[in-house]
UniProtKB/Swiss-Prot annotation:
Enzyme class: hydrolase
Job of this protein: Catalyzes the hydrolysis of 6-phosphogluconolactone to 6-phosphogluconate.
GO BP field: glucose metabolic process; pentose-phosphate shunt; pentose-phosphate shunt, oxidative branch
Protein name: 6-phosphogluconolactonase
Source superkingdom: Bacteria
Modified residues (N6-acetyllysine): 287
GO cellular component, one term: cytosol
Annotated catalysed reactions: 6-phospho-D-glucono-1,5-lactone + H2O = 6-phospho-D-gluconate + H(+)
HAMAP family per the UniProt record, alphabetical: 6P_gluconolactonase (MF_01605)
Any one Gene Ontology molecular-function term assigned to this protein's record: 6-phosphogluconolactonase activity
Organism: Escherichia coli (strain K12)
Protein EC: 3.1.1.31
């Protein structure tokens, strides 16, 4: 398995393309100059395209991915109704979902043969919309509205329209600020990192049409931490055994172990990392974690080791200015 790591650096308007080898070492293979401040990125389900959101002219760009080395070639673009904060796709590669924090909306862009062709739906009134996350069964779009302490739930119709479910939302504790999410491989649990109180909620997905319950909330910070909380990103290993979340104020990655059924998280430790880690990701083998420092302009690669899933630094690399997003593609 070959793996390519993409790093988005909005301040220098670049995507750095790296080869990740089996020992966790990175080799720079390409630097792409992007026409705008590039932030969120996602690889298409068929691994043919990388979709990226750019500002200040709000657009989604599609780059064709070379199957041999992961190199990028611009392919298409489509306008967006707000500044892109987060980007994702459905599992069949029919739609791109874009959450916009500043515009307070989530939009759906239709794809034709992998290329974006236009927005088909926009839902407004989602204050602080920070991500759009399709459930493993491709039926429910989870959309955290950070400023409203709620996660809105939509069914995605065949033509890409978003239909509010019943119930239409789940709520967090006041002041939590739900931000990014991941799902357990067994498709029974979701995990949401809350930006404003730096906690992680575990949501049990009992029924795709309702009966969703928060079964655990864990503080992700050390006991003596008294500074402003500012959590950012969350990821889980492919085998579902280890979960990670980061806080930008503390420049820290919190390590969690996950119970066999996915219902219980246990805090295992903390890893100091790059300054202001806005984004990170786990590779497809589940052996390595790559974290980007928005203020350090570097990335660090960590090996995931032991039953606890603790992190051991393998290498550190300079990238563009203000790196914010990390995507890993296996090909």
């Amino acid at each position: 398995m070959k793996q390519t790591v993409y790093i988005a650096s909005p301040e220098s308007q670049q995507i750095h393309v790296w080869n990740l080898n089996h020992e966790g070492a990175l080799t720079l293979t390409q630097v792409v100059d992007v026409p705008g401040q590039v932030q969120p990125m996602v690889v298409s389900p068929d691994k043919r395209y990388l979709y990226v959101g750019v500002r200040p002219e709000f657009r989604v760009l599609a780059y064709r991915i070379a199957p041999d080395d992961g190199a990028l070639t611009f392919a298409a673009e489509s306008a967006l109704p707000g500044s892109p904060t987060h980007i994702s796709t459905d599992h069949q590669g029919q739609f791109v979902f874009v959450g916009s924090y500043n515009a307070g909306n989530v939009s759906v862009t239709r794809l034709e043969d992998g290329l974006p062709v236009g927005v088909v739906d926009v839902v407004e009134g989602l204050d602080g919309c920070h991500s759009a996350n399709i459930s493993p069964d491709n039926r429910t779009l989870w959309v955290p509205a950070l400023k409203q302490d709620r996660i809105c739930l939509f069914t995605v119709s065949d033509d890409g329209h978003l239909v509010a479910q019943d119930p239409a939302e789940v709520t967090t504790v006041e002041g939590a600020g739900p931000r990014h999410m991941v799902f357990h491989p067994n498709e029974q649990y979701a995990y949401c990192v809350n930006e404003l109180n730096s906690s992680v909620d575990v949501w049990e997905l009992k029924d795709p049409h309702g009966n969703i319950e928060c079964v655990q909330t864990l503080d992700m910070m050390p006991e003596n931490f008294s500074d402003t909380r500012w959590a950012a990103d969350i990821h889980i290993t492919p085998d579902g055994r280890h979960l990670y979340a980061c806080d930008r104020t503390a420049s820290l990655i919190t390590v969690f172990s996950v119970s066999e059924d996915g219902s219980v998280l246990s805090k295992e430790g903390f890893q100091p990392t790059e300054t202001q880690p806005r984004g990170f990701n786990v590779d497809h083998s589940g052996k390595y974690l790559i974290a980007a420092g928005q203020k350090s302009h570097h990335i660090s690669v960590y090996e995931i080791v032991g039953e606890q899933g603790l992190l051991h630094e393998k290498g550190r690399y300079a990238v563009g200015q203000g790196p914010m997003w990390v995507v890993v593609n296996a090909h």
